[in-house]
Structure formats: C-alpha cells, structure tokens
Amino acid sequence: MPKASASSAKMTASTSNVSSSNSKLKKSKASSPSASPEVSTPSTSNSNDDQDGHVSEDMSDAEEGESQEHSASGSGISDHDDDDDPSADKDSPAADEEQDEKKVATIADDGKKVEFSDLGVIPQIVEACTNMGFKHPTPIQVKAIPEALQARDVIGLAQTGSGKTAAFTIPILQALWDNPKPFFACVLAPTRELAYQISQQVEALGSTIGVRSATIVGGMDMMSQSIALSKRPHVIVATPGRLQDHLENTKGFSLRGLQYLVMDEADRLLDMDFGPIIDKLLQSIPRERRTMLFSATMTTKVAKLQRASLKNPVRVEVDTKYTTVSTLKQHYMFMPFAHKDTYLVHLANEQAGHSIIVFTRTVHDSQRLSILLRLLGFPAIPLHGQLSQQARLGALNKFKTGGRSILVATDVASRGLDIPAVDLVVNYDIPTNSKDYIHRVGRTARAGRSGRSVTLVTQYDVELLQRIEAVIGLKMTEFPGGNDKEAVMLLSERVAEAHRAAVRELKDKGVGSAGGSGKRKRKMDGKYGDDMDRDDDQVQAGLPVSGNGRHQNQNRKKGRR
C-alpha cells in the first residue's frame, strides 16, 4: 500500500501546473476551432526476444517492457481544477429511481453508411478515427454516439467485436474537449486485459487533443498507480476492486468531480460478483453525472444495475441475438481423445504462418501445450491467470505484434480483447457453456473481417457440440484435411515425446497439476511467484484465494478475503 504522505505530496505538486495549462487551451481554441492541436502519440512497448520453450523463460519473456501507466500528454487539453467543487453530490442514485421499461427508447436499425462527422463528432476526433483506420462508424456507434453527445445516459446492447469501446469513448473525449478537467471520466472493466485495451483506445482516439489516462488494475504496484493518479489524468480505466482500494487508501484521490461513468461488459462485471463493490463506488461519485452501460446481454442483474445507476436512459441495440457473426466459418475436427495433441499439432502445421489462438480449459493445459508447441518449432506463448500482470500484457503484445503467432490461452482471453488480425481460433477443449464458445470464436472475424474457428471434438464431446450448434443455429462443417488420419498419425511419436518433456518441465516448476486442475501445487519460483491469480479484484469479488495469495498480499485489508 502506498504511503499517504508521498502520494499526497505528489498530488499537491501536480496542481501547480493547472493554471498555466488553461492558457494553452484558450489559445488553441481561439486560433482555430476546427484545427487539430498537436498529435500526442501514446507510447507502446515491443518485445522481440526469443524463448526456448521452458516455463520460466516463457513467462519472463512475456514480462518484457510492459508498464502499467498509460498517459499521453499533449497541448490540446488543459485542466480546470474543479475537484473540490462543493456542488458535487457524493450520494449514489436512490434505489427507488426505477426506470419504466416502456420509457426506455429503442432505436431501430437503418443500415445507412455514415461518416463520423455526420454524427456530430468534432474534426479533431474524426482525424484520430482516420488515423486508427476507422473509415465508417459501426451500427452501435451510429446509434450510441449522437445520444451520448446530447448528454444522455445510454444503455448499449451489442455483441462482441461491434465497436462498443469507441461508442462510449468518442462522446467522452468530445465533452472533455469542451470542458477539460482532471478525473473527468472513469471506465470500469471486468478484467485487467480489457482495461489496458480500453486505455489504449482512449489514448489513440484522444491523441489529437492531448488526453491523459491512467490504468488502475490489480496485480500492479499500488505506489506506481498512486503516482499516476497524482498526475491528475483526464480518464481513469480501472477494475472495480483496485479502484476502490485507491479511493479508500490513497490520500488526496477522489472522484468528487467525475462527469462520466462507464461500465463496460456489465454482464460480466456482475457475473464476477463485483456488484457490492460497484455499489460502494456509486456512493463515492456525484449523482449529477452521465452514465453509460454497455453489455452483450440484458440480464436481470444488468437491468437492476441500470435502474440503480442511470437516469432516463436511451437504449440502443444491435444484434441482440446471442450468436456468431456471418463472416465466421465454423468447423470441427473429430478425433480419439488419446490423440488430441497430435491433431492439434497437425492443425498448427497446416495453418503455419497464420495468427492462431488456442483456447484451453485449464492453466495446466495452456502452459503444457505452449511448451509442447515450442519444442516442435511453433512460435507459441501462453496466456493464463497464473501469469503476472506484466507477463500477461507482454504475451498479448508479442501476439499482437507478430512476435508469436500462436497464443495458447484460457478464457482470460475469450472476451473483450480486440486483437486486430486473428486468422483462426481453435477450441482445444470444447466449452461447456455456449456463450463461452461465442466469446471465444469472437476473437476472429471482427469488424466485418472474415475468420475461421475449429473445435476439436472427441468421443466425449459430441453432445456439447450439438448443444452449441443448437444455440448458434447452424451446423459446423468438418475442417478440410482434418480426416487425413494417416498424415496426422505420422506426427504421433514426436508429439508424444514433446508431451513427456513438457510434463517434466511443468512438474519441475510446480505449475498447475498433472491432473489438469489448473491450480498451483506450490509457490512458483522466480518471476512466477510474484503474481497471484486471485489478487485484489478476485478477492473483492468473493472468489477463492490460495494461501500463497493471502501471504503475498499482506498490504491488503484483512476484511477483503
């Protein structure tokens, strides 16, 4: 936990720059209302070092060069220091402010191609959209942005990959341009990876107006995050548990002047039992604010949260049927359970040079298959909850930049993450929940692009496959080349040898368990031991914590276990 005096001193010192920044804003707007200020490009890290397939090097390689603070300082926006505004109401919306569903407007689809400028977006942000390759707004953006620009609360329902992030980010940035303040907006996300991704989009979309953002998530150093908050960013992107920690323990930090609150992936936020923490957060921010809630589904919990936190919202919907996109080709490969690894290697060999995500059910299989593939010459890297936060970000960065073409991941990567060019999604373990399947395959065929998915089906998985087909409303086809048993079995001896080597490696390092439960057998040594899968956010969400996790988080309040 950061020391209060150090954090307070930093925050006090940072306020001295506010008055000088105000004059810059006036000059910038007076010179040309439509001219774009200097572009401030957010920094990115790139890791290119090689790995040799060993567990310790897999994880340490992934940890390279990732930092938790994202800030893009520019000349476009300066801050009005209104944190101590006495008019800010700290009370949360009363529970009796229920919204009659008949009064919630639903906007119909029109399918019309429009430009961002047609939606009322200012030239500075249109320029940023162009720089990011956004040619036209997506349907959810067409519907949500004009309503949000009119300072209305918004409920957005859209499937994964529909462009929800820009739909709430653009109106916030435009309001910030008109009325720049520190701690102007806060975005809540259910996972750390999604929080970092949102922060990157905020900085990219705000690069032409000099937006500063901070990412506040569990698994990272509290002191460093306190320093980031002392710089008074315009936008905070956070996971609920760690944000609540800072509100309670970081001296000088508050959200009394907050203007915008966004809850992204709200259904998942509530599925992870963050509801009590969100209730506390709502009591720490002004009632007079704009609130946006985005979700893939309108569950009972989401509807309850809507009534408690939004005022007279407009409801915008796009493709609310829970299904896969039409540009996705979905296949299966049928095989004996005993030769599952061999079929996976055969598939990876057939798809060499393509970007592939392999989804597993357990941490053990994620790590084992990553090592197995590396031993056979495939550039694979793992992503799972037992990696440190820096390692998880590093793994994503390597996969996004092409340093590794195969990402072997648990469901930590199945939702919310926008990886631009994923050619193929492989379900090594078929998910038991149809929604999990939809989110997994949603990592490809995004934003109108085409993509493929292949589900590995053994004699034990036929019923699960049929259940998924019933939900998505189509029959999967057999993957071309998947029935060439002779070609597959030629690889069996080498795959079996690589499997034995991978299991020995895992046993030596104590990662996962031979039974595939995915839980740690003992404290991981080296850089593995610095992270706990069940840290701040999971603890506050009421999820179980290992003994090691409690021991390594001595700074956490005892009541949050």
UniProtKB/Swiss-Prot annotation:
It is found in: Nucleus. GO terms for molecular function: ATP binding; ATP hydrolysis activity; RNA binding; RNA helicase activity. SUPFAM superfamilies: P-loop containing nucleoside triphosphate hydrolases. It catalyses: ATP + H2O = ADP + phosphate + H(+). One of its GO terms (cellular component) is nucleus. Coiled coil: none annotated. A motif (Q motif) lies at residues 114-142. Gene3D superfamilies: P-loop containing nucleotide triphosphate hydrolases. Keywords: ATP-binding, Coiled coil, Helicase, Hydrolase, Nucleotide-binding, Nucleus, Ribosome biogenesis, RNA-binding, rRNA processing. Interacts with the SSU processome. Belongs to the DEAD box helicase family. DDX47/RRP3 subfamily. PANTHER family: ATP-DEPENDENT RNA HELICASE RHLE-RELATED (PTHR47959), RNA HELICASE (PTHR47959:SF20). The Q motif is unique to and characteristic of the DEAD box family of RNA helicases and controls ATP binding and hydrolysis. This is ATP-dependent rRNA helicase RRP3. The gene is RRP3.
